[in-house]
Amino acid sequence: MKPLTPRQQQVFDLIKSKIEVTGMPPTRAEIARELGFRSANAAEEHLKALARKQVIEIVPGASRGIRILLEEEAANDEPGLPLIGRVAAGEPILAQEHVEMHYQVDPSMFRPQADFLLRVHGESMKDIGIMDGDLLAVHKTQDVRNGQVVVARVEDDVTVKRLERKGSTVLLHAENEEFAPIEVDLTSQQLTIEGIAVGIIRNTDWM
C-alpha cells in the first residue's frame, strides 16, 4: 500500500470512526463539513485518491458508498478460511471484527476456490440443502450469472439468495416457498454482490 498523505489519513480516520460509531460511512458533505473542506467535491477528490491507493472502495450511485478494504487484507493474513458471522452495516464483509475464527480447510477443495465461509442464519434456502447454522463457502467475485446462488448486500443487509436480473431490477429468490423474493430496484437501491456460493460445510462436522 502506498503511504497516505496527512490529509488522506484524516479522511480515512474519519471514515473508520463514523463506521465504528454510527454503523455507516459518512457522506461527502459530512466529510467536507467535519474536515473543513470548501465543498463536497473536495472530499470526493480525497476519496478517489484513497481508492487509487486501495484502502477504500467507492460504490457508485450511493451517497454513503464507501467501503474500507484494509481490514479485508488483514482478515486473510491468518491460515485457513475466515468464518464470517454477523456483518455490520457499511463495513467490508471481511472486516476483522466480523471474523469469528479461521477454519483449517483447504480453499482449493471448492471450485472456484473459496475465499471465506459465511455462517448461515435462517431457513430461506433450505430446499437446496443450505440449512440454518451451516457454513457457506463463498468465492469472492462480482462476476455473477442469473441462477447462481450469491451472497448479496442489499443496502445494509447481507443475504444468501438465487440471483435473477431483469433490466434495472434484480430479484433475489429464496429456496423456500414461505419466503417471497427480494426485489431490488437498481435505480434507487444499492446492491453489492459479495460472492457466489461454492459449497457447504455442515457445522456439526467441524465442531
UniProtKB/Swiss-Prot annotation:
Active-site feature positions: S124, K161
Keywords carried by this UniProt record: Autocatalytic cleavage, DNA damage, DNA repair, DNA replication, DNA-binding, Hydrolase, Repressor, SOS response, Transcription, Transcription regulation
CDD domains membership: S24_LexA-like
Record site feature (Cleavage), residues: A89, G90
E.C. numbers: 3.4.21.88
Catalytic activity: Hydrolysis of Ala-|-Gly bond in repressor LexA
MF GO annotations: DNA binding; serine-type endopeptidase activity
Gene Ontology BP terms: DNA repair; DNA replication; negative regulation of DNA-templated transcription; proteolysis; SOS response
Binding region for DNA: 28-48
Pfam families for this protein: LexA_DNA_bind (PF01726), Peptidase_S24 (PF00717)
InterPro entries found in the cross-reference section: LexA (IPR006200), LexA-like (IPR039418), LexA/Signal_pep-like_sf (IPR036286), LexA_DNA-bd_dom (IPR006199), LexA_repressor (IPR050077), Peptidase_S24_LexA (IPR006197), Peptidase_S24_S26A/B/C (IPR015927), WH-like_DNA-bd_sf (IPR036388)
Subunit and interaction comment: Homodimer.
Similarity comment: Belongs to the peptidase S24 family.
Function recorded in the entry: Represses a number of genes involved in the response to DNA damage (SOS response), including recA and lexA. In the presence of single-stranded DNA, RecA interacts with LexA causing an autocatalytic cleavage which disrupts the DNA-binding part of LexA, leading to derepression of the SOS regulon and eventually DNA repair.
Name of protein: LexA repressor
Taxonomic source organism: Vibrio vulnificus (strain YJ016)
Native organism taxonomy: Bacteria, Pseudomonadati, Pseudomonadota, Gammaproteobacteria, Vibrionales
